Amino acid sequence: MELLVVAVLGLLGIAAATAIGPKVGVAAPLLLVIVGIAVSFLPFVPDVVIDPEWILAGVLPPLLYSASVSMPSMEFRREFGAISGLSVVLVVVSSVALGFLFTWLVPGISLAAGIAFGAIVSPTDAVATSIVKRIGVTPRVVTVLEGESLLNDATALVLLRSAIAATAASVTFWQVVGDFVFAVVVAVMIGVLVGFANLWLRSRVTDATVNTVISVTVPFLAAVPSELLGASGLVAAVVAGLVTGQGAARRLSPQHRQSDAQNWRTIELILEGAVFLGRGLELSAILSALQAEESRGIAVGWRIAAVALVAVIVVRAIYVLPTL
């Protein structure tokens, strides 16, 4: 019963933040983080610790699939070069640059570990996209940022896994590159296969409700086999969504597409809101753990984080400005 009450309150909080955010000029994800932080410091609220596996396996595949399946086909094809550059090339370049920076700032850290940390902080998230939409930039910029957000998390996680593998074993640079390429290529193949199978099956189902139920399973049908084969489940989910979105107008009825769009918008709202609310709720537990550390170590950590933030902004500016 207690878990049910928490879930209901969380849903109400997500709905309220989404409705109030635009009125107060604050992006809904950022507002949810603030609410989560405030709640985490209430004396009767226990420490919240979320298993990362729940996010990686249960939340991110449908969240990224939802965003990719709703991506406008024409705009995505037109801006594919910019989107792929930002979501793949820029993430890799930023992660490697931060890897060298961390090896210089933190004594004893290896380059592979530095790149792993760089992969964690390089991608943009929903807050950035929400802020950009609100300040009224051109539709092209919004399309590019939304497209970038589809793949940059997946790219960063593949790079993170490869970097962690490099820290745990004696592997060569080309072995790491091979692992990265394998994870992406196999995931793309599975995503394409699942996407076309999804369109084929659902074009033969007449009931809109059954059609929607099938669609909810698609990101997991793409992600789970990919992970079992050592590839990226997130890349597979994104590709399956892109294939579905590109072919839906030709293969699915208007009723099915409308039902799909409404249900996936709801799922995306709930999952994205839960992620940011959870970030805020975890802060109290994180600070409690940090209190056991030396204050000097915490201060050094803040300085390193500030330098890393500046470095990410500089690298992104150097990459983006010539393309404007």
Residue positions per predicted region:
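Transmembrane helical cores of multi-pass secondary ion antiporters/exchangers
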Residues: M1-L324
